Amino acid sequence: PKVLLLLENNEANLYFINNEFINNKNIEIKPILGSCGNKLLLEKIFKENKVDIIFHAAAYKHVPLVQENPIEGIINNVLNTRLLCEEAYKFSIKKIILISTDKAVRPTNIMGASKRVAEQIFQCFSEESALQKKENPKKDCSIFSMVRFGNVLGSSGSVVPLFQKQIDQGGPITLTHPDIVRFFMTIPEAAELVIQAAAMSE
């Protein structure tokens, strides 16, 4: 890409990710402090920048915290997702990719359920966009797609740091079921999956 917009509501995270790119002269980086739940900010971003692709990774993803704070979890994971989709649709952004989770499959907790609803929101906008394209083939219509992750090693939402801490303290390791099986991918594998989702979405 020529320009990469980093929209992040956590000041420290935005500072650190911006610093990772600071020596990259091939891409212009624009750090933007704010939330995808801010309608006025989204409109400003889309008016001032030619946005082609949105990777929507904003979500509360720690299961116990969302379980204890369901209203905030739903606002962030569901309502803000709907607002982003509405604005992306309105501005005819080419592609919007939702970063979802395997916990959205037959969800057993509020976090998983909120991500499943976010997926359904994307599906609704995808169907509406496809209908508009069918009615007017020359119209620029957005493509809504999604990708589901399992556990990503080294990510902020991974269970691995918890396991490491429990092992360092002599155990035991907290498992939800004795027969539980967990699948992991690395950050580079996850990044490649997201890029493939963007490339394959039509």
Language model features by range: what are they?
Residues 9, 37, 76, 154, ...:
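Residue-level signal for the nucleotide or nucleotide-sugar donor/cofactor binding architecture
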Residues 31, 73, 96, 144-147:
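Hydrophobic/aromatic anchor residues within beta-strands of the central parallel beta-sheet
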Residues 86-89, 110, 116-201:
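NAD(P)-dependent short-chain dehydrogenase/reductase
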